């Protein structure tokens, strides 16, 4: 499911919002949907962004400060910056991943971009609908992106013999044939406060 192009596109947007210096995600979404930003303008923007000390989203919102990029590309980059800044605001306001994705695909015109009249268009749109349903169980964006990273990692390593090192919180809900819990020291983990609270009803 997470290997489908449309799902990867949406997740790249979310990763960039969550980690504004994620160049790989930015490179994936900068022209999705098409914004008319050429390779030369993109390269000049990234050089300027790196020298400015700003993260990618901040640089997009201050792109008028550079004259090395064409006016048309600056406008397109600034518009993208406004969308991403607004989505960042939703994350900071504690909106759910479903609300964030819904706003994102509306603001970017991504759904219209998917419905391009090809035979695959409806299937792609249905996949976005399935993603919106799937994220309902996540309270915040960080939790969802962590789950995506775990699923992607599991898919990559499927069938390989390996040891997976993770926190107890990251392991919640997962199943393994053998589990070793290290650092279990009474009073530290579980916390001594567990015993002070008394039995749960």
Region annotations inferred by a language model:
Residues 1:
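Conserved phosphate-binding/catalytic loops in two-lobed NTP-binding clefts
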